[in-house]
Amino acid sequence: MKKTLLIAASLSFFSASALATPDCVTGKVEYTKYNDDDTFTVKVGDKELFTNRWNLQSLLLSAQITGMTVTIKTNACHNGGGFSEVIFR
């Protein structure tokens, strides 16, 4: 029973790690803009990415104003790609 539990716990940790969103770009927010399709675009480093997560907008604007460093995490790490996760540093 303990061996089965250990294997199940190991597999769940592995699958959670495999699904983790990779870092795309780290830097300061250069600019932000609202789009006609109700999305919000930010430029960090050499990437211009969008999100439809309204709860991130005020946080990203604050990061831009204060010069905070952010890390955008996404699987679509190309200009015009979308994201839904940000780390504020």
From Swiss-Prot:
Result after altering residue 54 to G/F: 100-fold reduction in cytotoxicity
Q: Which domain of life is it from?
A: Bacteria
Q: List the disulfide bonds.
A: 24-77
Q: Name one GO biological process term.
A: symbiont-mediated hemolysis of host erythrocyte
Say if the entry is tagged with keyword Signal.
yes
Q: What induces it?
A: Maximal induction occurs at 37 degrees Celsius and in low-iron environments.
* A GO term from the CC aspect: extracellular region
InterPro entries the UniProt entry points to: Enterotoxin, SLT_beta
Q: Which residues form the signal peptide?
A: 1-20
Which keywords describe this protein according to UniProt? Disulfide bond, Signal, Toxin, Virulence
Provide the effect of residue 58 to P. No effect on cytotoxicity
* GO molecular function terms attached to this record: toxin activity
Summarize subunit and interaction data from the UniProt record for this chain.
Shiga toxin contains a single subunit A and five copies of subunit B.
Family listed: Belongs to the StxB family.
Q: Sum up the protein's function in the record's words.
A: The B subunit is responsible for the binding of the holotoxin to specific receptors on the target cell surface, such as globotriaosylceramide (Gb3) in human intestinal microvilli.
Give the comment on domains. There are three Gb3-binding sites in each subunit B monomer, allowing for a tighter binding to the target cell. Binding sites 1 and 2 have higher binding affinities than site 3.
This protein's name = Shiga toxin subunit B
Query: What organism does the record attribute this protein to?
Result: Shigella dysenteriae
